[in-house]
Amino acid sequence: MTKKYLSLLLFTVLCLTINAQTYQKSTAAAASFTINSDSTATVLEWFNFIEGKGLVLSYTSTHVNLQEKVKVKQDTYSIQNLLSSVLAGYDFETSFLQNKILLQIKGLKRFHVSGCVYDQKTKEPLEGCIVVFMNKNQRQYAAVTDYKGVFHKELPSEPSYLNASYIGYEPSIRVFMTGKYQNIGIGMMQTAIPLNEVKVMNSPMSDVVNYRGASSMLSVNSNDPFAQINTLPGIYGSSVGGGMHVNGGQDDENLILLDGISIYHSHHNNTLLSQFNGETVEKVSFFDSFIPAQYEGRLSSVTDVRIKMGDFTDHHQSIGLDLPSASLTLDGPIIKNKLTYMISGRHSWIDFMKDLFSDNASASRAFNDLTGKLHYRINPKLAVEGLIYHSKDEYKDSINQIHNHKILGWENSLYSVSSHADLPRGISNISSVSLSKYSNSIYGPAINIPSDIFINEGMTKISVKSNFSKEVDKYMNLSWGLSMGHEKYNLLASQDAVKNNNQKITQVSSYINSRIKITDKLSGSVALNLVSYLPKNSKSYFSMQPRFTLKYAADEKNIISLDFSRMEQFYHNVCVGEIPIPTDLRMPSINGFKPSSSIHGELGWKRMDDNWRFSLSTYYKRRYNILGIRYDISNTGYEGWDRFIMKGNAESYGVKVHSMNQWNKWRLNCSYTFSKSVEWFEDYKNNKKNPTLHDVPHLFHCATSYMVGKDSFLSLGGYIKSGSLYNVYNEEGNISGQFISHRERRKINYRLDANFSDSITPQKQHLKFSYKVGLYNIIGNPKEDEIIDLYSIDTKKHCLPYFSLNIKF
């Protein structure tokens, strides 16, 4: 009986204890708060408000911003609901004990948002689309889609909506549904009037131009994909037939790719002519600081031009008439939603009318090119493409009493087949097989060779590439690949000789590149490129080229970056004159001509606002084993390149500033570069450092456009730059053949251009007119080659009026 009473007593005590604990818990948990009107206060002030009701909050402030202002709407709240409103962006847990609240704040909530952006009509992914996320407090975060149109972003707060923007497409705004943040599909519609502009992506800070730049408006061509690149800081354009000097480098140190396939000499015989037909270009990626590991073979920059495919559902035609050339472009489906075509051709036309414009009726420059692409979508995970490109440049003049005789010419050809596949385990692959050719010829008598023959030189390359990529997780993305190429050089045996010398070279390379998200604010890429260079009859070389970049996002608008790249170049091209000819030095790394190499470091800061982008960077570049022409000796009677070419080193450094603004109806694009470029050679002036011929200490570009109407713009812009250097030398005597030489700087170069552009859409929506009328060199003192190469047009004060027209139907 005693045991029975004891058991009953223990049960009663236990029930009372549980009831007391429940009462203690419910004392705090049952508290309610009435907010009479919408109120905004800091987190700390809201905590004080809760404690003012007789409750005790116990928390640590390590993972919460007590000064953040939070708005709470008018209502009656339980303690749990009020804390959920005040700490809406945080992960936290609560427990209650009498009038005490134990608050465990774990940190900010993380929302992983992902999706794909594509063309609503063709279903093609849109690479480089900017996706901006905004939360309820109007804070913005941005992401950029990859080549598959996919984006990923970790957000510190719940997004309310996103805004996707892409060149030539209407902006797409998407409101988020609560909890649905993954695998978002965003279809975008093209604008009624195409913007006629490609996207330019510029390393080191992924500068994606998402509106029509003022500098692009000033191009003489109706659609010039390189107009904006030529005005970027650190870039100094060279003369006709040449390329550009990037960060103090030579013009043979820039790699030009067409759909990932190298082009030996993509430039044409006129500075006003775009390298490629803008109607065929989808996008241009330009790298001059951190160069991704899949690119190799040049020291200073890489320009990767991607050719667009045809429309999957409708046929389109485009006719263009510019000052340099006329063009025709056709594209559309062969099998709807399966097989498309795109074909485009350009041809110079002023050479047909040269008699009306030139004092010398027999001198002319002719040009034509052809670009074509087939795209076959086998299934959603596999597609095959075929690309063809051919260009031809000629210069004709009177010689040996023969009028309109071909003097000089060069040709480029490229053929490739590629596949794009999504493999198992999230791996993507792009593989290609390609054939590229370059040939150059000059009429013998034009260079004092009496034989009535053409001197020819050229190169042929067959290559196989396979690139892979995989998103390992939200913190790492890996890419790797392997390529093999076989080159055949048809070289002149010597600078004066007509005989050719064939050289065969095999090159094998591999790379790995990892993009890593270290923290929410710190990310980077580490890459390595390995090359085996295997000439048939000369010394072999093995190259290791490490590269890395580090980016720190101080906040949503400011990015600090640090880049390093080591590059190696196995191809040398030294031009004796302004225009490339077969007797120039074109030499692979054989017969004692070692590879050139470079190291490049750059520290940059970039600020991105809604309508303003600003970047500032400083760089240092060191180049080893570069080649130069000796101007202090005569080449009379010379039978080889050895005494005519110098080998040495060079360095360059500078500061680059770039600003792009857009407000109301105005657009402004400005860039400034301060730089120094020097070189030194063992066989020249006792190895003393001397400014390079392309040393331009100050270079300023500026262009502005005013939106007169919906698609009408009035643009004004130009440049001011230090004059470049040139060699001055006089022969001392005929016996020694020695020269006394020094370098002098030309006068300051400047130029001012203006134009008006407009687009008109008649009632028939399938017909669109775009035109441009302007003045080239209204006032100025440009380099002489910018004037004499205007298709031999001679105008007073060299002010050239121009007109371009583009019709789409």
Residue ranges and their predicted role:
Residues 324-347, 359-394, 407-429, 472-478:
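Transmembrane beta-barrel wall of Gram-negative outer-membrane proteins
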Residues 87, 139, 144-146, 168-170, ...:
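Periplasmic N-terminal accessory/gating domains of Gram-negative outer-membrane beta-barrel systems
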Residues 720-732, 751, 758-809:
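C-terminal beta-signal and adjacent terminal beta-strands/loops
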Residues 620-622, 645-730:
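Gram-negative outer-membrane beta-barrel transporters
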Residues 22, 47, 51-54, 59, ...:
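Short, acidic, small-residue-rich periplasmic hinge/interaction motif at the N-terminus
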